[in-house]
Every structure is written in C-alpha cells, then in structure tokens.
Amino acid sequence: MLLLNATDRVALALLLERYGMQLALIAPREGIPGSYWGHSEAGLKGERLYARLDTPVHSVLHEASHNICMTPERRAGLDRDAGGTDLEESAVCYLQVLLADELPGVGRARLLCDMDAWGYSFRLGNTRAWFEGDATDARDWLCQHGVIDATGRVTGAKRSSA
C-alpha cells in the first residue's frame, strides 16, 4: 500500500490546489479531522483535505475526488460524510484512478492494486476489470459534469451544478 510518506507531497499539494483544496498534514498518531473511516484514512472538511504521513495515497485521492464530484452546496457544508448517490460514488472511484496518473510515482496501475488491497468492491471482481470494462456510467457522469473531457482526461474543473 503506497503511503503519503513515500510520495511527492509537493506534487500532491499542487494537484489539490488546482481544484481549490489545501492539503493539511496531521502529526503522527493524531486523529485525522473529517475522516470517515478513522485510523490513518484521509479526512475532508470543506476545501481542506487532512492526512498523515501514514495515510494511504488511494484514500487521499478518494476524498479529493469526493470534493471534486459533489455539488457546491454539499461542498460548502462538508465535514466527514461526502454523501452522494451510488453513481456519484462510482464516479469518485473512477476519478481517483485518473488523478493517480497526475502524480509522479503513483500512477493508475499502482492505485488499482492498492484499491483492491484495501477492499474496494466491484461487480467484475477487481478494480482494473471494473475500470476497464464496467465503468462507462461513471465516465459518462464525470464527462456530463465537466470533470473529464470527451477523451477521458481530467479538466481541472469541479462539478458546478446538480
């Protein structure tokens, strides 16, 4: 499992900044504000993403993707529980894979393996099979909301409407 301490945190902070988010590093063994799962999992409050050096990168990218994919109204009151529909959750998972390609030393292949190791569950049995063969609805959702373009590349834009 790739942890934040083994990644380029400057590149991650710059990626988050493109979306108007700030990365807040928390001291070792301290609780992570806004964490849905607790332990070392990333937390989200408004535009601030909280993590420790032992936070898995997939967790950071997942929470960032929640922020990007939610409506502005939900984003404004965000504290711990991102909410959203099942389709939005699929879009979040798809986007976190795309964002992994934006980070040196992370990449899609590594993130897909880490998502499987953590326990993400998809109909086709693993994250790669889902991403490559069963995620058209998630991709369409992201495109419809302007988060990715027609070629599947991230636009740097957040969802701006329902």
Indicate residue ranges for each PLM-predicted region.
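Post-HEXXH active-site segment of zinc metalloproteases
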Residues: 34, 39, 68-98, 113
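Active-site-flanking structural segment that lines cofactor/substrate pockets
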Residues: 44-47, 64
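Long, well-structured alpha-helical subdomains associated
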Residues: 103-162
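Auxiliary, metal-adjacent structural segments of Zn-dependent hydrolase domains
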Residues: 1-43, 50-54, 98, 102-103
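Active-site recognition of the HExxH zinc-binding catalytic motif
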Residues: 58-71
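Secondary-structure capping and boundary motifs in well-ordered enzyme cores
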Residues: 49-57, 84, 88
